[in-house]
């Protein structure tokens, strides 16, 4: 289950900490938090056993805790503190890039192993990890904190730590997990119906299924079945390669053998304190050394603590997992010696199944229990009475030998190693198909990770063509679409592979909020090329000339109907008006009705601002948000707004007043003077007297301030801030407006008897909501619509600071 503050923007003030019952690990000591942060420095995350206070300070915290600080020491270092003491203080320039843009991070804790990474998806892009020698396995609550500056957080999610990272990535995108009310965490893989997380060697513990050896225990010679390859990979048992081995254990009781086998098959067991010594001796006899060490440590612990002997007390023994998040990923935590297991595979010793690739006349020797350990599909094949259950040979067709060899090596080593050859990408795709076919979930996950790591603008189309047909690769498909959208120009001009995509995929890319282009004309060209399945790159002008000699049906063939579906994704209103006029006179407009209708609609919108009736999507008349820079409000008087950003020459140097630098222009209703100074509004310096005086316009008194962002810039404003000067002329009635030409104004927010301003020098901020926040403007105006609270100067608009926020370009 995921606890999420989805898309909720949270600002944490200096020396404070935000807590929530939702931000809690499911299992104490084990969990992962992922979030976006927006800060100058000191993104601080606290992990405690209980919820802390709002005014939190680690030096005053006497409870056990971990603190991770990203961007400490002026945004240069990473710090980890344990119970108030610094244990990590590292240079981390790759991680510590707190800035005026949201950065994505994740932090996981697993029994004291703290892992920190960048990016949207947990367990990808690991940057740093540290193991606490004395782990605190009880931390459970997550606090979002700050140091001496405000920090903004959003998209905060808490995940369980699991090997199935692909599932977590789906949760990042979907922001929900369907689970039962009891909170049990279950992972059911798409298309299999199998509960993979519950599958493992424990299913074969003391099971006659696939067994090939038997223990005879005690004087009564009780039969206990086992599997040679598992025993020999975990220790050194007296076994032969032939079937029917029997191991006599007359002097051993069943509970002792059961504990040994349970440890081997599941990585954990529980035994009476009085049976520790016999279990140690039996483990030593068969050289299961990790269990020997566990028994000896428990015996020594009881001796040192001088605890009274209790024959009824049970002791838990666990196989240690040193790297839970590493690439080594057996589906069970059993104490396997990987070197031994690989050797057993290479020699074929104890093999009980031969896999014959019919198309290539190749044979692989393997062990049914190992195949079943990784694949529920193989397990069903060998145990449900199918012909393979009774045969020592199975035949497979339509299988790449290189991919099958890689899958077998993965099953025995727990790692995916593929040679970086010319055909690497093709073989990886074949291996992905194979992992999906047999339900080898960890291998499927590793293939997906490799695909993501090597995914580029050049390969995204070929990968999309393949993964769109695999139901379990929806996440990879979505990430490919996103990459295509963000590099649309390149992906549609460097090659014509995109015309081979199916219509649904291409349509999803065109609809994406991440779609980034240098010109809407590029989208028009791409749609026309896709619809004609072009073999060469063409602009709309070339295609228009082709229509002098061919009608639409012969030019677009079977994709002619697709024009009606795809052309509405082109935002014709973003094209220059002169280009629209050329398009209106083109053959495309004359021969294709939907083309003509969309052009007329765009021309009407540009000339009158009206949208034709018919419930047309409003998105067609908006700028693409992805081409704007995000400048979001954090707090009153921050340095995150547009005027500050422009003053840094759009992020390239130290701040200079943008009015003095002539980057923007601020005007007022009264002439510039000592107390009406436009550059004062762009400065953070407090001014005791700063106002725009009244003037007569169209027979009415008017007082206003206007900001001109410049001919080449626009802002979709979603917040604005101003500051009262030293007077008591508090504004009560005013409008905040936007305009493209400085003449026709659109109301973005109307204030009627607003009582917010009540102190001299006060800051105040207001959000712009609904569709108004999606409209881009060059000019912004604050205009009084009624008298202020000061009867002596009721029409002076008295502010000494102004800042705008939103999406800027």
Swiss-Prot record:
The keyword Repeat applies. Residues 211-273, 351-420 form the BTB domain. Pathway: Protein modification; protein ubiquitination. It comes from the Eukaryota. The keyword Lipid metabolism does not apply. Keywords: Repeat, Ubl conjugation pathway. InterPro entries: BACK, BTB/POZ_dom, FA58C, Galactose-bd-like_sf, Methyltransf_FA, SKP1/BTB/POZ_sf. SUPFAM superfamilies: Galactose-binding domain-like, POZ domain. GO terms for biological process: protein ubiquitination. Residues 466-537 form the BACK domain. May act as a substrate-specific adapter of an E3 ubiquitin-protein ligase complex (CUL3-RBX1-BTB) which mediates the ubiquitination and subsequent proteasomal degradation of target proteins. The BTB/POZ domain mediates the interaction with some component of ubiquitin ligase complexes. This is BTB/POZ domain-containing protein At2g30600. It comes from Arabidopsis thaliana (Mouse-ear cress).
